[in-house]
Amino acid sequence: MILDATTDNLEIILDKAITTNQLSFSVFYNEYTSTTVTPSSNYGTTNSTTAVNLVAAPSSGKQRQLRYCSINNVDTADVGVKIRFNANGSYRNVLYVYLYVNESIQYSEEMGWRVYTANGEEKISSFIKLPSSIRMPEWFGAGALTQITTTNSTA
């Protein structure tokens, strides 16, 4: 992810006010000019529903490339976390994740964005919120389901 304009920022914003502790983050990026590369970092905390820069806009003639980012939910409650690209007030959502207590988000150039459980395991499942009632076809009425069979594949 590269920020190449003086109006480009990578931001974090939460979906609600925190309960006890703001989320903490650590960011590492390279700043490029036409002749140099300077490794840089940013450490901080969120500010509830107010956006905070993970990587601030580069100054004129420079570019910033995100190398690594770690965001940790150190609050006592679950929270929605949005990472967004701010191009001079034009927002593009990069990632939205609901983090449970002690879960984390990590970004690396090699792996992209990943979410980890409180135990450090990669969170790979997703859930679909279903409506409170589902209309089933008429042919699937009472008595239509007569047997449940479990099949194991050896492939």
Predicted stretch roles:
Residues 1-155:
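Surface-exposed, low-hydrophobicity beta-strand/loop segments enriched in small/polar/acidic residues
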